[in-house]
From Swiss-Prot:
The protein, known as: CCA-adding enzyme
UniProt key word Nucleotide-binding: yes
PANTHER family listed in its UniProt record: CCA TRNA NUCLEOTIDYLTRANSFERASE 1, MITOCHONDRIAL (PTHR46173:SF1)
GO molecular function: ATP binding; CCA tRNA nucleotidyltransferase activity; magnesium ion binding; tRNA binding
Keywords: ATP-binding, Magnesium, Metal-binding, Nucleotide-binding, Nucleotidyltransferase, RNA repair, RNA-binding, Transferase, tRNA processing
Family classification: Belongs to the tRNA nucleotidyltransferase/poly(A) polymerase family. Bacterial CCA-adding enzyme type 3 subfamily.
Cofactor(s) needed: Mg(2+)
This protein's encoding gene: cca
Length: 399
């Protein structure tokens, strides 16, 4: 099969392929970018595979960087663009179900494609637009099926993260998992305990943000993979609560998705749960803030202080999630209340601790912090104007 029109992302990278071929080697576009081109989906990263060994690749191009040369990858700098060029390779026995004990460079495209995870990710595309399809991936693409390359159990034993990737691809593409592939995934889910939490988080996060997240999550639940994820053992019934969200609902952000997950799981200690997933502090705080906003909304409308406390984006994401839960919402009222605030950050207050110490005799400590907070909330509540005259008058009254 030949692409009738080469996507612009590939056209831009063609000079790299052509230079490698002029040097006497093979070179192809590979991986998800080829799949996305065939599906007419947006193309993100353009990856190139070649028969040239890393040192040979570096001799072809004047500007390169070693980013994973032990695995055969050289970063080629072509004008303003950067491309990862990786040597065809085979992999030895995998250690800990996550990484090969050794990588061997080869000259064979077929040997390289054999080690890919799913047939729809095992395409190669040459400079003429010709598709190399050694594992009937085009047929699977047509049937919208996710099938492991070769023997499914071998692929998942090599790298157990591929199990989570299978659920994630199902969520992003909306494809069905081929029965033997899914059977192997279900059998080998205990291997997920060998995968780093960080890698698992990335795949689970992508699953939740995907347009067909319900399909991916349903397969994950059916496989009982959750039993091998941090703090999620025996959580099937609670995970199913996510399916109570509106049918066509998709998450706006990772923070919103994980807030929904914690809501579904009825997690009492969000901080501990997110720590077990090794998320960043900033991410954990935003997820917890969303949960706090949701709890506040359960008790009625948000106050001015509530709107001041949180970023408007989080306030609206919480409202969006409430709507998906089938609850009453009023995003316009929240936006108007937020916009009506005199200040949105205490740094905007027209007085500071230094002035209070110098002009009013306050000493650093709890009393100073207390009066500053009092001024801050008086301004937020609309009881005090945010200008020096008004604040000084307020302070004189306090004295």
């Amino acid at each position: 099969m030949r692409l009738t029109q080469m996507p612009s992302e590939f056209q831009k990278a063609l000079p790299v392929l052509e230079k490698i071929k002029e040097a006497g080697f093979e070179a192809y576009f590979v991986g998800g970018s080829v799949r996305d081109a065939l599906l007419h989906n947006p193309i993100h990263d353009v990856d190139i595979a070649t028969s040239s060994y890393p040192e040979e690749t570096k001799q072809i191009f004047p500007r390169t960087a070693d980013i994973g040369i032990e695995h055969g990858t050289v970063l080629v700098l072509d004008g303003d663009e950067e491309y990862e060029v990786t040597t065809f390779r085979t992999e030895d026995v995998y250690v800990d179900y996550r990484r090969p004990s050794a990588v061997s460079f080869v000259r064979s495209l077929e040997e390289d494609l054999k080690r890919r995870d799913f047939t729809v990710n095992a395409f190669a595309l040459d400079e003429t637009g010709e598709i190399v399809d050694l594992f009937h991936g085009l047929e699977d693409l047509e049937k919208q099926v996710l099938r492991a390359v070769g023997v499914a159990s071998e692929r998942f034993n090599e790298d157990a993260l591929r199990i989570m990737r299978g659920f994630r691809f199902q969520a992003s593409l909306g494809f069905a998992l081929e029965p033997e592939t899914f059977k192997a995934m279900k059998t080998l889910t205990p291997l997920l305990e060998n995968i780093s939490v960080e890698r698992t988080f990335v795949e689970f996060d992508k699953l939740l943000l995907a347009p067909f997240w319900r399909r991916g999550l349903a397969s994950m639940i059916e496989s009982q993979a959750y039993d091998y994820l941090p703090d999620m053992a025996s959580s099937q019934d609670k995970l199913n609560r996510l399916f109570d969200l509106e049918t066509d609902f998709t998450f706006e952000s990772s923070e919103q998705a994980w807030a929904a997950l914690l809501w579904a799981l009825e997690i009492e200690n969000a901080q501990s749960f997110l720590k077990s997933w090794k998320t960043s502090r900033q991410f954990a705080k935003q997820v917890q803030d969303l949960l706090i906003i949701l709890a506040l909304r359960e008790n009625g409308e948000l106050s001015k202080r509530d709107c001041y406390r949180f970023d408007i984006d989080l306030l609206l994401q919480a409202e969006n999630l409430r709507q998906a839960q089938g609850k009453e919402v009023n995003p316009q009222a929240i936006t108007e209340k937020y916009q009506s605030l005199t200040i949105h950050d205490k740094k905007e207050i027209q007085i500071n601790g230094g002035i209070l110490i110098k002009e009013y005799g306050y000493q650093p400590g709890p009393d100073l912090g207390e009066i500053l907070t009092e001024i801050e909330f008086a301004i937020v509540d609309g009881e005090l104007e945010n200008n020096r005259e008004a604040i000084h008058a307020y302070l004189r009254e306090k004295k």
